[in-house]
Amino acid sequence: MLHDISLKGLTEKYNMDVKGVIHIGAHRGRNIIEYIDIGVRDIVVFEPLSDNFNILEQNLSELNANIIGHQVALGSEEKKVTMYLSSNDTQSSSILKPKVHLTHHPDVSFDDREEVEVKLLDSYNIENCNFIVIDVQGYELEVFKGGKKTLEKI
């Protein structure tokens, strides 16, 4: 399962030198300490949900690292959208209306909503990052469409 893959494991297996990480869909930042532990110097995180971002900011403030956080969703065009908030600690929240998820995980509901701002990854002009972690519940292609220039630098 993809969730079991660690950045440390990837860097060791493929002899990668990860200097900086762009983490899209950072939730509350539980992976950030791993990035720091393996020597990642620059970290840029994106998390659109306000409660998650507040917890993320608090968690980041306790770390002595070069971390920049942005409270936005990323996509292929700038706009405001409604996110569907999941009942599983918002881990499955999505810009896309839940369909298949409801069948595979009937215990998870999407009763709450939150308006979020969507921006282009390219609008951030990120330097010094050579690795992307993305977890946006099926919206990955839209994020990559808005990040073509950034992807060329990775």
Predicted regions and their residues:
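Phosphate/nucleotide-binding beta-alpha loop and adjacent structural elements of enzyme active sites
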Residues: M1-I154
